Amino acid sequence: MRYYRITIIRFINKYTKIMDWIESDSYLKGIINNKPKLHDPVRVASFDLDDTLIVRSKKTQKWKLVDSSIKQKIAELIENKYIIIVFTNQGGMSLNKKFDKPLWRKAMDDLVKILTSETDNDFYFAIYVAKKYDIYRKPNIGLWNLMKQDIKDEFNLDSVQISTKSFFCGDAAGRIYPSMFKKKLYPTSKGGDFSDTDRKFALNIGIKFLTPEEFYLDSKNSENLKTNYKLSGVNPTEIIDEIENTKLVNYKFKPRKKEMIVMIGQPGSGKSFFVKNYILPNGYVHINQDKCKTKAKCLSETENALSKGKSVVIDNTNPDVISRMTYTNLAKENNYDHVRAIIMETPDELAKHLNNVRHIYSSGTVPKVTDIAYNIYRKNFVLPQYEENFDKIETVTFYFDKSMLDDPKWKRSFMKFSEYK
């Protein structure tokens, strides 16, 4: 029965070229398939959408093809046994309440019809859309993994082997100066690429990366099309090399009786790792808002621990005087003489990368801290002073525990390039 259903769907798809759309909370995907089988290994010709395949009007939803040669090139790719895939970040779908998704899907159905108008061959064409800032958003490879699973299901395969001829083409390449196409599409633009997420996406997958110029112009002397680029944020390989070739000195934590410790640091700075490995083994009560859920519950648990004369560690971001003194005043009221501030000194780009690593490692169950939260932290941050009831203020440079690299999944998560703004 399933075979006949798939055959009918393929027949309908071939002549209507209407995609079968499926939506989840995090992604939207549309697939049109009329191929009975795939080339093995699978040849994937994948593309970004905006300013790679189409250029969109900023005022309306109207669009046009970036280059007129795209239809013939898609036909040639299909002739050469490639499947055609689009991977696109569309955060506006979740952030903009006025985003017209039915209209957008209709535009994509029209795009598929146009892009495949010059081929009579059977084809597999899919569009994968990341709606949120999570594991599916490029350069994270959630959409790529979703594509592989869909191929397995669609063709009843045990595994999917990707051909070395596969590639991803996108305009977010981290180029420093305006590209040839950018000058053509946006004549007044003087800056380079707005992002580098497309290049990082290809690097994270491990397939060839092409800029639109390299794909469309197909120059024999491709060096003329290459421009200088710079990847933002952390280069995971460089960090790993530094860790494996550097003798790191452990922080010497000295516990004190009847003490309150207030941790200070942005999300992803290593506070909780530090607390778990250095402070909690000494019997300190752990106060963390992710566990308590509310500020009131945190304060209640802190008050309870202090009333029993226990040492406590406040494991929150605590960027400003008010957030810190809410706790240090409790210590003073309970006659605590030992109140220590520990500042986690972690580079911004590394903290954001670790935020993404934590999200990937958890398979998306631990949500990413938003850029807005980072901006609020930076805006509110004030260095702690002794006048806040502290008798000791320490700064800890981020310490990377080599043992974390023994976990293959964690190392794979860390080695993926992340988006950095």
UniProtKB/Swiss-Prot annotation:
Its EC number is 3.1.3.32, 2.7.1.78. Residues 235-415 are annotated as: Kinase. Keywords: ATP-binding, Hydrolase, Kinase, Multifunctional enzyme, Nucleotide-binding, Transferase. One of its GO terms (molecular function) is ATP binding. It catalyses: a 3'end (2'-deoxyribonucleotide 3'-phosphate)-DNA + H2O = a 3'-end 2'-deoxyribonucleotide-DNA + phosphate; a 5'-end dephospho-2'-deoxyribonucleoside-DNA + ATP = a 5'-end 5'-phospho-2'-deoxyribonucleoside-DNA + ADP + H(+). GO terms for biological process: DNA repair. ATP binds at residues 265-272. The keyword Kinase applies. InterPro entries: HAD-like_sf (IPR036412), HAD-SF_hydro_IIIA (IPR006549), HAD_sf (IPR023214), P-loop_NTPase (IPR027417), PNK3P (IPR013954). The keyword Hydrolase applies. Residues 25-231 are annotated as: Phosphatase. In the N-terminal section; belongs to the DNA 3' phosphatase family. This is Putative bifunctional polynucleotide phosphatase/kinase.
